[in-house]
Amino acid sequence: TVIQGYALLKLPQAEATQPLPRDVVKVTFTSGTTGSPKGVLLTHQQISAVTESLIEVAQITSDDKHVCVMPLAVLLENIAGVYVLLQAGAQVLIPSADALGMQGSGMDTPQRLLSMIIQKGITTVILAPGMLEGFINVIEAGHPAPTDLRFCALGGASVSISLLNRAAALQLPVYQGYGMSECASVVCLNAVNSNHIGSVGKALPHVRITLADDGEVLIQGGGFTGYCQNFGVGRWI
């Protein structure tokens, strides 16, 4: 067929795409550590279960003030930072990368973020281990430590016990945890009144963890919907 001199190609009819379950509100992709990245389906129920548990464990109140350091595309910051604090009626600050002292994906000038935390009275923050090390180096070099900061969650990568011990020596309120995309981020977290260095803490209140006969760790809680094109894969992860 020719319309005003342009030929229209007849394309094969595409197959209908399977719609997502109606209660899915977010699709987040895994990092692909053990295979190709998969689109994880997260429901309102699953996200709410995590945020309510984190509010309880981290003792978040409307008096808290959180600063987003990680990109909002990072599920940990998205859920444990923004959603948790807003659900509790607290404040969330989203500064520019320059204001945070970020250069690319790394923290070029940690003293800039540290100064902001002090000046703005920030009470909660989420850091990767490399960011925490930058903080510690600056404070050990003589920069004042933040006095209002009461909960610094650590995630995104494994962390050495020596780094946690350095943080403890400076009386920094650092709490290590563990999570995965399929569980809407956080699964375990050290609590304010129960912080054990070298441990990822206890399972969140809505989570159940057990071991299979072969030693595999099985996690249940919040309702796992599945992946894109693979719904209803089971109750355990």
Regions found by a protein language model. Name each.
Residues 12-29, 36, 59-65:
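Conserved pre-ATP/AMP-binding loop-to-beta segment of ANL
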Residues 1-4, 38-41, 90-98, 103-104, ...:
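Short beta-strand->loop structural element characteristic of the AMP-binding/adenylate-forming
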Residues 1-18, 118:
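Structural core segment of the AMP-binding/adenylate-forming
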Residues 45, 130-133, 157-158, 162, ...:
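Alpha-helix/helix-capping structural signal
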